[in-house]
Structure formats: structure tokens, C-alpha cells
């Protein structure tokens, strides 16, 4: 999960403006980007494979294909590396070139113009088919990492509205009937980490709605998610990992770090 840590590190740089720490961590960033390119873009097409990269990775693999969410992570990391290179006195041109290459590859090969959202991934072998049923993590990473332009973001969020299962949140004494939650994918059959009702995924999707300009839907999903976890859950005030509405596991864990982080970002 180097990708996620590096993304966190970039956010830290942006938040603090600590250029001394940028210089200290620059060698790590260089090694990380070299490692990503060497292992996950072996064919050099600008699309990156994903292996043990995100929360859902337990049962998630792409057999060497080009993946939207991992390519988006690498786009931002290279884009920012090109900017940070000026601070540390390094040549950032190769990182700028790689970011451009990634963005072009995503738009040419993974963005489905006829549908209006990103494919989950593209097969490495055979007919190099696109897997068109994107997960939540594909949509929100595309928006959060900056590969989606405003119209692509709008269209991708309509995919969430229209193709990701919506589950009403209902409870005795709960008067607000507008609350709902989402499953992470529309994939079948059910298996762990591939089709869950997971609070960090919901909060990151709410953030994507805010970033995409739909503040009303963002707040409704955010409120729904926190109400279901902190008020309706088995442990008052808890920030859970999985929801009561998860089909197999049900409510899971107490004050899990992933949703705590996303609750902080959305707040």
C-alpha cells in the first residue's frame, strides 16, 4: 500500500508547507516512483497494475492489467514530484512527462466516452477487454487524484447514482426517510472485500460528490453514513469499518482507522 502512504505524504506536504521535510523525504519519493514503474507498468503504456494497493485489496487483483485507481494514484504522485523537484533542486521533467503519459493513457484507454465513466481496468492479455462495472474506489480515486475534468467527474458521479446499489437506512423512530447507504460495487457473487457496505468507501464517495460539485448529495451520503454508524450502530459514537447492512459480515470493528481518516477529510 505504498501508493496510499505516498498520497498521504503529499497531502502532508501540501498542508504544512514543510520544505525541510520535503527534502528529507525526496529520496523515498524517487525510490517509490521507480519501484511503481518497474513493477506495475512493465509494458510502459502508462497504465499501472494494482496489487495490494488499496483497502479492498484482500480479494482484489487485476492479473497485470491497466487499472484506473492505481494509475490515478501514480498520476498525482508523478505530477507532484515534478513540482517538488524544483524545491529540492532536481530535474522533474521525467515525472512531468510520466504524469502526462498516464493521463493520456487513462483518457484514451480507460475512459468510456460512450458510457460516461471509467472502466475498472483493461485486461493485459487476450482481447484486452475493458471491465466496465467500476467500483466506488474507481470513481472517487479518479476525482480525488485529479484525473477527471469537471464534466468527467459529473458523469462518473451519475454512474454512482444510477448503477451502484442504494440501500435505504431505516430504523424505528428514525423520521428521516431520505438516508441511504451504498455497496462498494455491483459485482456478483458476493465475496469479502469486493462487495461490501464499508464506511471508509462511503465517506470517500461523499468527498467525491463534494469535489464534483454536488454538495447536496455529498452531505446526504455523509450524514447517512455517520448516522448509520455512530447513532444506529451497536456501539454509540463508533466509527465502524463495515455496516449493519453488509450482507454477510454485518457491523464490524470499533473506531477503524480508515473511516476515521476519511471522516476527518470530509469534515
Where is each model-derived feature located?
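C-terminal capping/lid segments that line or modulate ligand- or cofactor-binding pockets
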Residues: 1, 5-6, 119-159, 191-267
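The feature captures the catalytic groove of carbohydrate-active enzymes
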Residues: 1-4, 34-98, 104, 109-144, ...
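Hydrophobic or amphipathic alpha-helical targeting/insertion segments
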Residues: 8, 12-16, 22
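Alpha-solenoid helical repeat scaffolds
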Residues: 15, 84-87, 215, 228
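Alpha-helix N-cap and loop-to-helix initiation/capping positions
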Residues: 21-24, 94, 264
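Long, well-ordered core segments of solenoidal/helical folds
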Residues: 25-45, 98-117, 149-178, 215-234
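Charged, glycine/proline-rich intrinsically disordered loops and linkers
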Residues: 170, 174-183, 243-252
Amino acid at each position: 500500500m505504498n501508493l496510499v502512504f505516498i498520497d498521504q505524504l503529499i497531502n502532508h506536504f501540501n498542508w504544512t508547507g514543510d520544505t525541510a521535510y520535503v527534502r528529507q523525504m525526496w529520496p523515498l519519493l524517487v525510490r517509490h516512483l521507480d519501484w511503481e514503474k518497474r513493477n506495475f507498468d512493465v509494458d510502459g503504456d502508462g497504465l499501472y497494475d494494482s496489487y495490494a494497493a488499496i483497502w479492498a485489496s484482500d480479494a482484489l487483483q487485476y492479473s497485470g492489467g491497466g487499472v484506473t485507481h492505481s494509475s490515478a494514484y501514480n498520476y498525482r504522485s508523478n505530477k507532484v514530484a515534478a513540482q517538488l523537484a524544483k524545491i529540492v533542486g532536481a530535474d522533474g521533467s521525467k515525472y512531468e512527462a510520466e504524469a502526462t503519459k498516464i493521463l493520456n493513457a487513462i483518457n484514451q484507454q480507460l475512459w468510456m466516452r460512450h458510457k460516461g465513466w471509467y472502466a475498472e481496468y483493461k485486461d493485459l492479455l487476450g482481447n484486452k477487454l475493458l471491465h466496465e462495472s467500476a467500483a466506488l474506489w474507481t470513481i472517487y480515486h479518479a476525482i480525488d487524484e485529479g484525473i477527471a475534468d469537471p464534466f468527467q467527474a459529473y458523469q462518473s458521479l451519475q454512474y454512482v447514482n444510477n448503477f451502484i446499489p442504494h440501500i435505504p437506512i431505516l430504523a424505528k423512530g428514525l423520521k428521516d426517510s431520505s438516508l441511504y447507504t451504498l455497496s462498494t460495487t455491483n459485482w456478483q457473487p458476493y465475496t469479502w472485500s469486493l462487495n461490501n457496505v464499508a464506511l471508509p468507501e462511503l465517506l470517500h464517495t461523499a468527498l467525491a460528490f463534494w469535489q464534483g460539485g454536488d454538495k447536496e448529495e455529498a452531505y446526504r451520503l455523509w450524514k447517512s453514513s455517520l448516522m448509520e454508524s455512530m447513532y444506529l450502530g451497536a456501539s454509540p459514537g463508533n466509527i465502524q469499518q463495515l455496516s449493519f447492512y453488509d450482507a454477510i459480515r454485518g457491523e464490524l470493528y470499533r473506531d477503524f482507522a480508515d473511516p476515521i481518516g476519511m471522516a476527518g477529510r470530509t469534515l
